Amino acid sequence: MPAPLKGSFESLARQNEKTEEDGLERILDEQDLQDRIDHKMLVPVPVSASLSINNNLAETHRYVRPWTATFLGDLSKAHAQRFDGPIQVTSAVRTVDYQKQLMHVNGNATQAEGDVVSPHLTGATIDIGKNTMTRAELAWMRNFLLPLQLDGKIDVEEEFRQACFHITVYKSYAPPLSPAAPVIAARKARSKAGAQVASTDDPQ
């Protein structure tokens, strides 16, 4: 069994630094959150047969950054190739106001204000529940996540009181397409279509 991916204050500080480098701001309240949803800065958690979400989360708290959604899609598809049943997102975006409330009921909750705060406030972070995972699934998750952490694409803190994988995904996980990428893709599509037409026209 691979060792747990334990967190540390250094890891939390790094998550704050890197999300700031990614240009992400802390989401203050529900109005601020709704504005970012309306402007497509946050997208829905990509729920599917292989990825579920905690039904207790408010509708507006079921959103993440686009690259975090891409990561969740990749993770859930890879998990589904090995195991039955979906993985579950137990927490996604939070606001500063919500985090303050959480601190009153959860002694494990990270600060809402200051230099080092919960990266959930940026929308880049999700929690994946561990309660229903088998030992084989836990081992698989650790083996899947560790290389991405070593590559600087994510940071992981395996929590035990809340029984989850706390994962912050960085923008570099799914960098935006370059301006030329759509043009190149269109050329490739046209070239492929032309080749198919030529093949159809060939005499038998």
What is the role of each PLM region?
Residues 1-72, 147, 157-163, 168-189, ...:
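Extracytoplasmic cell-surface/polysaccharide-interacting catalytic and binding patches
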Residues 57, 61-72, 92-95, 119-121, ...:
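Solvent-exposed, acidic/flexible segments
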Residues 59-60, 73-78, 113-114:
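Short secondary-structure capping micro-motifs at structural edges
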Residues 69-73, 77, 100, 139, ...:
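Solvent-exposed, polar/charged alpha-helical surfaces in well-ordered, non-transmembrane soluble domains
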Residues 77-84, 98, 107, 146, ...:
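Sec-exported extracytoplasmic/periplasmic mature domains
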Residues 85-102:
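Acidic helix-start/capping segments at beta-turn-to-alpha-helix junctions
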Residues 97-113:
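Charged, often glycine-rich, active-site loop that binds/positions anionic groups
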Residues 110-204:
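Catalytic cores and adjacent binding grooves of peptidoglycan-active enzymes
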